[in-house]
């Protein structure tokens, strides 16, 4: 693999009902409106617990109501939905051979998930999952396995046997970077590259997507690496709405790296601090729907959300503020209308709901929260309309 200088990644997702175990149906919500969404929440939980929960969330009032829960998956810590929301894919984040990827169907009328099938990831601790642009493959980033698994999908959306992409190398941090640690997989907005963030080797592995029918999804021979600063620890990435810039959060150095993206090439144009306390626990990153503000979460010290304004000319960032949160904000999500930012606080067992000022980008705690054990992934899915 040839090496470039730069960086990248992003992500998106949603979810579904039913299970290997059982799905419980709570109260129904009548007459869905354009203000109502499904909020799908992944968590750290035992298989016999409802590790995935479905809520109805009103993005005008900022209030959520429990709809249903799904058991049967151990540690469903990350979810991704199909574009139409009818299918959801979830990791089963165990560290050994029991690690899985799971296919679910989602009944948007009832707000219920049901289990389709499961496949082993052949790599421990899968922590991120994504769908290919044509929604004919699912890929997992396996943190302890140090690899990526590529699953073809069958006609029902079921997972077929997966194939692995194996990586080598290490980084300067002997405790955190003794081997490859894949933390995020996602496709560029134009669908031409798969980007795999490797926290263990300070690289983004980039794979062109094959364009010819009958070929494998990825052109492995044309793959290359984007090399980052030693000890950075790349974690998650998001793209601007126009697809011209990417924003990468590094877990260990606590930076947001701004990259330009053009013709399958990434170039670093700015590095700015999100974690000023050297907590080495930066986690998630998202951009507002209007593209004007970037938000990044920090854990371990000074738990909260760093807020940056975006320069509309060149995509660079300027610090705009900081919002304290509950403990261990591993993941967060912004409502499609941009009015609210929801934070999954793993160690305070709650989803905090913040109102977002569209002019300043700043957040205000509404006092509303959803109590749930160890929430770590939030995805919105539109409700079906009658």
Where are the regions that the model predicts?
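Bacterial Sec-dependent N-terminal signal peptides
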Residues: 1-36
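An edge-strand/N-cap motif at the start of beta-rich repeat modules
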Residues: 24-58
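Short loop/turn segments immediately following the C-termini of beta-strands
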Residues: 44-46, 93-95, 143, 153, ...
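Beta-rich, blade/repeat-based domains predominating
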Residues: 48, 73-84, 122-133, 137, ...
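Short loop/turn segments immediately following beta-strands, especially the blade-tip
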Residues: 56-62, 104-112, 150-160, 207-217, ...
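Blade-loop segments of beta-propeller domains
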Residues: 65-135
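A short beta-strand motif characteristic of beta-propeller blades
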Residues: 65-71, 114-120, 163, 169-176, ...
């Amino acid at each position: 693999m040839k090496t470039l200088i730069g960086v990248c990644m992003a992500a998106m997702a949603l979810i579904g009902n039913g299970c290997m175990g059982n799905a419980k149906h709570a109260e129904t919500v009548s007459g869905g409106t354009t203000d109502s969404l499904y909020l799908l929440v992944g968590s750290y939980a035992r298989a016999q617990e409802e590790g995935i929960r479905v809520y109805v969330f009103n993005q005008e009032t900022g209030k959520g109501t429990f709809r249903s829960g799904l058991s049967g998956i151990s540690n469903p810590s990350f979810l991704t939905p199909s574009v139409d929301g009818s299918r959801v894919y979830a990791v089963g984040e165990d560290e050994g051979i029991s690690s899985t990827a799971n296919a679910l169907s989602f009944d948007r009328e009832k707000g219920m998930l049901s289990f389709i099938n499961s496949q082993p990831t052949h790599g421990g601790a899968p922590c991120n999952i994504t769908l290919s642009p044509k929604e004919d493959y699912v890929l997992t980033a396996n943190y302890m396995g140090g690899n990526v698994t590529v699953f073809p999908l069958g006609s029902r959306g079921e997972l077929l046997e997966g194939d692995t992409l194996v990586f080598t190398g290490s980084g300067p941090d002997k405790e955190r970077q003794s081997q490859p640690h894949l933390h995020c997989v996602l496709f560029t907005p134009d669908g031409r590259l798969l980007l795999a963030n490797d926290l263990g080797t300070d690289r983004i592995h980039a794979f062109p997507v094959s364009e010819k029918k009958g070929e494998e999804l990825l052109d492995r021979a044309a793959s290359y690496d984007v090399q980052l600063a030693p000890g950075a620890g790349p974690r998650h990435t998001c793209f601007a709405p126009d697809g011209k810039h990417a924003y990468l959060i590094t877990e260990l150095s606590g930076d947001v790296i701004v990259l330009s993206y053009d013709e399958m090439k990434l170039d670093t144009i700015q590095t700015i601090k999100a974690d000023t306390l050297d907590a080495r626990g930066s986690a998630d990153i998202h951009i507002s729907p209007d593209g004007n503000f970037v938000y990044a979460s920090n854990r371990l010290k000074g738990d909260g959300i760093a807020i940056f304004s975006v320069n509309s000319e060149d995509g660079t960032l300027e610090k705009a503020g900081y919002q304290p949160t509950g403990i261990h904000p591993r993941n967060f999500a912004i409502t499609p209308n941009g009015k609210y930012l929801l934070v999954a606080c793993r160690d305070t067992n709650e989803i905090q709901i913040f109102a977002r000022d569209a002019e300043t980008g700043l957040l205000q705690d509404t006092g509303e929260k959803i109590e749930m054990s160890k929430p770590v992934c939030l995805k919105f899915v539109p409700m079906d309309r009658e």
